[in-house]
Amino acid sequence: NNMLHSVRDEYTEKKLISYGFNNVINTSCPTTWELTEEHISDIDHSKSKDVVFTLTDYGKNYEKDTLMVNDLKDNYRNVYFWPQGLHDMSYFNKLAINGINVLAPSLPTFEKILIEENIDYVGTRLHAGIKALQLKRRALIIGIDNRAIELSKDTGIPVLERENIHNLPDMINKLQQLELHIP
């Protein structure tokens, strides 16, 4: 068979090859392909005054997610929550954190705030972080599973593993020099 199967990270490529699939190529996630050196050169290196964040309803960690949101409140002037998934809002409500601006759960709403405001993205939704980078906004993805973590290993997309969430204030306050390596 001369057809190739595209995968988004080296981990998946090696795993499939170990199972005997030799027609595999790591092309990274197609959503990253436009993140060229020229594109990312327009992304601010320093922290914005405002932030939009996401949570993931199927990857709950009440303690660490509460710490994340409170750290965002401590380090940004305005904090916005964008519920991407169907049950993200109910999860956010269970955290019982006040003082958060809640956005409508639609992609156009998320895109609008990224385009119109000087704002950072921090959150557990991988592709929300990639969307922020596509729209030339500073982003820090909180890695809750191997997808974001493995993609970061290959590409350099900024990811902080949730188990290290205590490092969030340092990560958001330091200058972020993006050096991406998209296959």
Enumerate the predicted regions with their spans.
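Active-site anion-handling motifs in enzyme catalytic cores
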Residues: 1-183
